[in-house]
């Protein structure tokens, strides 16, 4: 079973998509299997992250800003602004896909894990995520 979910972002931020993924798994009626998520973009990514304390996500963003600075004169690719190349680098350093086991019709996430779309651009975008469910 496969579907594309569209997520609207508000610019650079992390969007918790756990509920959308769980809903799709529930509708699939798959009790045991795998859920694969793949984002069709090169300036946003998918991560598993702490979901209870928003400071964790803020700290990750602050760390990434220190590692990959917007508008760095080192970058030649600036076609869409000072956040363009940094967004591509951030995407490469994180992940474009996740695979999560399914048991009893639910994602087998840890107690504090959530599934996040990490938008790396300044402006709002609509992002496509391909969700594929494989039955065991």
Language-model features, listed with the residues they occupy:
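Active-site histidine-anchored catalytic micro-motif
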Residues: 1-136
